[in-house]
Structure formats: C-alpha cells, structure tokens
C-alpha cells in the first residue's frame, strides 16, 4: 500500500503522485460510490498498484474542499481580479472572498491588467487595494508598467503550498500561470470583444508543479455563484465585521436596521469600506431570496 496526493482527475481515472515523485494512474474502489464518497484532486489517498492501473483504498480526511471546481486540501486561493477588460467589480471580488472564507481557504488577491489603466484609475485602485489589506487580506497590485515584482511576490507565496487560481473568465488566470512558468504552455484565453467575456481554455482540474508549488488551473470556477449558508451566518465571512460585532447592542445583530450597531458605526466612521457593507447587504438579500435546498433522502421505502 502506498500513499500519495491526487494531482489529476479525468473520466473516472485519478493520477496520484507520491512523495518520491512517482505518478500512478488509478481508479476508485466501488465501495466509495456506494458510501457517497468520491476522490477529488488534492485528496491524500492510500492506493495499491496493479499492473498499469492502481486502486484507491482510502481517502484521508480533508482540511477543506471546494465543490466547483472539485479540489481539496488547498493552502491558498489566488483570486485573479481584472481591473480592465473586464472592468473591476468590487461586488464580484467580495462574493469570491465570502465563498473562500466559508470554505476555510486563505485568499490572495492579485489584480491583473493594471497596465491598461489610466494614471487616475490606477491611483483609485491603489486606495481600494489598501482597503482590502486593512481587512487582513494579502493583496498584490502590479506596477502600472510591469508586473515582475508582483509576480515574484506571488511566487514566494505559492512555494511549498497547494494553490488554486480563480477569477472572472478572461481575468488572465492562464496568462499569469504562463508568466510564472512559461514551460507550462497553457493555452491562453482569448477575450471575446463582443461579449467582453473570455473563452474557457482549461478543460480539466490538474495540479501542476511550478517551481516548488502545486498550482491548480481549473475549467471554470463557480463555487462563489451560490451561497450554501444562511443569511444569518453571512457576517461570519466578513472579517472586518467579526472584528467589531461584539460591540453591537443586540446579540445576533444583522447589521441592517438594528440600533446601536457597531458594524454600521464602523462604516459611518470609514473604518469599514462602504462598498463592503453594500456587498453585505446585497448578499443578505440574495440569500434570503434563494430557494431552500433540500437534500435527497437515499433511503429505500
């Protein structure tokens, strides 16, 4: 029996890499399907080799996991956020941050396409970047004329860790990965001018070795499209709200219409950016309007 990490999943096959660098193609035992378990990229597993194909016998408990894309045991998630083509959208970035907070994955914000901004627009985004740093997030904003320093800082964050890249389609995920390691030869997405959206270029979830890092480039990242928690739990995923909410007069304050709300006071004083509070209110209403999810009961009657 050997232990390794799943680095690729495709059509029912799982490629596993061991600590010694051996790569073994495997399938999962039927018992996993019967118990509702399914191996995903990033899983640590026990497996046996049988001729060309191996068999997965055990999946170790996960530290964290995402559903869309299916990947587990992530150290950091790099949110590649375009500043132009497509234009920067604070609401989208906040939605991605909330999804990662809920999944217990550490976010890193990387602003792309800074070279397309005017001097005035770049100055404005510098202030926004600092707002996110004050919340506690790691933010990388490349210089307006090149991104070499920001790329080097990103590489140092990636080394020795498992990372996933996410962001709006066309934000430049594959372009950034190619810059980090040109030998990858990942196909770069072409932005559709008619739709102002990028064409998907990555077709499978794969962990790729880049220097001392394992990086996942994924076929569409949509874990942030649906909130799988209650509206009452939303403030748990806004770190700056968590930092001050004990000062609210009422326990369970929703930070909307309640008097003596420490969060609203922090917003009025400028300690919490108004854009973040607006995102919170929008997400709260969105969650409230979502249809309840019902889990399927698989018992036989």
Curated annotation (Swiss-Prot):
Binds 1 zinc ion per subunit. GO terms for molecular function: GTP binding; GTPase activity; metal ion binding; rRNA binding. Monomer. Associates with 30S ribosomal subunit, binds 16S rRNA. GO terms for biological process: ribosomal small subunit biogenesis. HAMAP family: GTPase_RsgA (MF_01820). It is found in: Cytoplasm. One of several proteins that assist in the late maturation steps of the functional core of the 30S ribosomal subunit. Helps release RbfA from mature subunits. May play a role in the assembly of ribosomal proteins into the subunit. Circularly permuted GTPase that catalyzes slow GTP hydrolysis, GTPase activity is stimulated by the 30S ribosomal subunit. Zn(2+) binds at residues 248, 253, 255, 261. It comes from the Bacteria. Pfam families: RsgA_GTPase, RsgA_N. InterPro entries: G_CP_dom, NA-bd_OB-fold, P-loop_NTPase, Ribosome_biogen_GTPase_RsgA, RsgA_GTPase_dom, RsgA_N. Transmembrane segments: none annotated. Residues 63-224 form the CP-type G domain. It comes from Leuconostoc citreum (strain KM20). One of its GO terms (cellular component) is cytoplasm. This is Small ribosomal subunit biogenesis GTPase RsgA. GTP binds at residues 112-115, 167-175.
């Amino acid at each position: 029996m050997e232990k390794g990490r799943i680095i690729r999943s495709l059509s029912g096959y799982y490629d596993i890499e061991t600590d010694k660098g051996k790569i073994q193609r495997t399938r999962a035992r039927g018992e996993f399907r019967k118990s509702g378990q399914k191996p995903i990229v990033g899983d640590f597993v026990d497996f046996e080799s049988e001729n060309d194909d191996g068999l997965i016998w055990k999946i170790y408990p996960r530290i964290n996991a995402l559903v869309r894309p299916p990947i587990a045991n992530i150290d950091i998630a790099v949110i590649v956020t375009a500043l132009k083509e497509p234009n920067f959208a604070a609401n989208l970035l906040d939605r991605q941050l909330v999804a990662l907070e809920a999944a217990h994955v550490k976010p890193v914000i990387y602003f792309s396409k800074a070279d397309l901004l005017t001097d005035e627009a770049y100055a404005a985004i510098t202030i926004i970047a600092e707002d996110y740093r004050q919340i506690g997030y790691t933010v990388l904003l490349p210089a307006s004329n090149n991104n070499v320093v920001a790329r080097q800082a990103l590489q140092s964050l990636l080394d020795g860790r498992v990372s996933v890249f996410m962001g709006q389609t066309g934000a430049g995920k594959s372009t950034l990965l190619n810059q980090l390691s040109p030998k990858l030869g990942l196909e770069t997405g072409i932005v559709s001018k008619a739709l102002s959206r990028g064409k998907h270029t990555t077709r499978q979830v794969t962990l790729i070795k880049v220097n001392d890092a394992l990086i996942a480039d994924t076929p569409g990242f949509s874990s942030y499209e649906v909130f799988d928690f209650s509206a009452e739990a939303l403030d748990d995923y806004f770190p700056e709200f968590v930092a001050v909410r004990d000062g609210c007069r009422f326990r369970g304050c929703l930070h909307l219409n309640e008097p003596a709300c420490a969060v609203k006071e922090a917003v009025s004083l400028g300690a919490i950016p108004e854009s973040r509070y607006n995102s919170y209110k929008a997400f709260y209403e969105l969650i409230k309007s979502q249809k309840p999810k019902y889990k399927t009961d698989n018992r036989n009657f």
